[in-house]
């Protein structure tokens, strides 16, 4: 008989201690934009190549003509109940932003908040070990961090990397005629929602863990390709939100082919059964006015396209002649489902789904 159980490992369940999980617990994009508008403009720093004036994945500071520092931080509440897996997912997700800038990680610091009077100490230790294991896989030290006693469990990393300042890849700079390539299948938010509702079987759980703990290492290699014009990763704002950011930053329209999108197992069926996250609706509220969805698409298309991804795949905008080399880089690192999902065309900061 096939085991259909999903590991929980803790009592109480980690996901029962938080009101959200993974990148789905980001502040809603509309509210975040309003909050950031209230901040004072950042003073000019000539060596700050990427700062907070754009919606990019990390900050980049030039040290010299050959080296720039990539700095980012990312943390969230549990998306799964297994503490080791939670630590792995959070660490993989944090390092992804370094790769998404074309950088190579150098070291990381842990961000830890745990209800220490609620969770057994061995559970908290397992979360930390999960993060350590991913840093070891990435070949970097987890060199320190900071911890607090918090009501809800949170874990993540400050990730520091290095990149050639001439090779920084941004979520802008795409060119008309570029091809869009996605590195990982979609649907993590829906699978995590199914897990909370005890609707996810062992196979679905395994697929989710495999996707969310796979390091986006091809990003560091993609930075060396002249044909790669823009790069980002798909996380809490969903495929539509992050593709729209790339389109706006490039002053173009992204055309996404719905039939070509890769999905994790069971995601479409779960969406049809009404399983989704609240972040999906918040994403649509923020971006829907700039999205074209034909009436011929399935009724679940909007939910699927706005599904928040945790530790999602890289989105590459590259010249047509670079497609084979980009796909070869992905597949050499085990990203067998990397595929072409659309193209960039003339327009003014929209996403058109066809």
From Swiss-Prot:
InterPro entries: PurM-like_C_dom, PurM-like_C_sf, PurM-like_N, PurM-like_N_sf, SelD_I, SPS/SelD. CDD domains: SelD. Binds 1 Mg(2+) ion per monomer. Keywords: ATP-binding, Kinase, Magnesium, Metal-binding, Nucleotide-binding, Selenium, Transferase. It comes from the Bacteria. Its cofactor is Mg(2+). It is an enzyme of class 2 (transferase). One of its GO terms (biological process) is selenocysteine biosynthetic process. GO terms for cellular component: cytoplasm. Transmembrane segments: none annotated. ATP binds at residues 26, 54-56, 74, 97, 145-147. Gene3D superfamilies: PurM-like C-terminal domain (3.90.650.10), PurM-like, N-terminal domain (3.30.1330.10). Its EC number is 2.7.9.3. One of its GO terms (molecular function) is magnesium ion binding. Homodimer. Synthesizes selenophosphate from selenide and ATP. This is Selenide, water dikinase.
């Amino acid at each position: 008989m096939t085991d259909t159980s999903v590991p929980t490992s803790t009592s109480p369940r980690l996901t029962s201690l938080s009101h959200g999980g993974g990148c789905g617990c980001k502040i809603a994009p509309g509210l975040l934009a309003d909050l950031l508008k209230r901040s004072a403009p950042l003073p000019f720093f000539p060596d700050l190549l990427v700062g907070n004036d754009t919606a990019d994945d990390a900050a980049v500071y030039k040290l010299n003509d050959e080296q720039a520092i990539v700095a980012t931080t990312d943390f969230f509440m549990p998306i799964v109940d297994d503490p080791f897996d939670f630590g792995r997912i959070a660490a993989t997700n944090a390092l992804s932003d370094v790769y998404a800038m074309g950088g190579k990680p150098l070291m990381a610091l842990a961000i830890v908040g745990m209800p220490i009077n609620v969770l057994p100490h061995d559970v908290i230790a397992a979360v930390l070990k999960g993060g350590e294991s991913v840093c070891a896989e990435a070949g970097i030290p987890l060199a320190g961090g900071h911890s607090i006693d918090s009501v809800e469990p949170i874990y993540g990393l400050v990730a520091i990397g290095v990149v050639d300042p001439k090779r920084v890849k941004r979520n802008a700079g795409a060119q008309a005629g570029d091809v869009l390539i996605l590195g990982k299948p979609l649907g993590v938010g829906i699978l995590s929602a199914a897990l909370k509702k005890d609707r996810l079987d062992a196979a679905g759980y395994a697929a989710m863990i495999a996707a969310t703990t796979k390091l986006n290492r091809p990003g560091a290699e993609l930075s060396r390709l002249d044909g790669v014009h823009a790069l980002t990763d798909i996380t809490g704002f969903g495929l539509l939100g992050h593709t729209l950011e790339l389109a706006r930053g490039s002053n173009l329209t992204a055309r996404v082919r719905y039939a070509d999108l890769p999905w994790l197992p069971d995601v479409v069926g779960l969406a049809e059964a009404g399983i989704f996250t609240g972040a999906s609706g918040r994403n649509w509220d923020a971006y829907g006015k700039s999205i074209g969805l034909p009436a011929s698409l399935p009724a679940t298309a909007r939910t699927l396209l706005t599904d928040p991804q945790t530790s999602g795949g890289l989105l590459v905008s590259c010249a047509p002649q670079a497609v084979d080399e980009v796909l070869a880089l992905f597949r050499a690192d085990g990203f067998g489902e990397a595929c072409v999902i659309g193209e960039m065309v003339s327009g003014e900061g929209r996403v058109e789904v066809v």
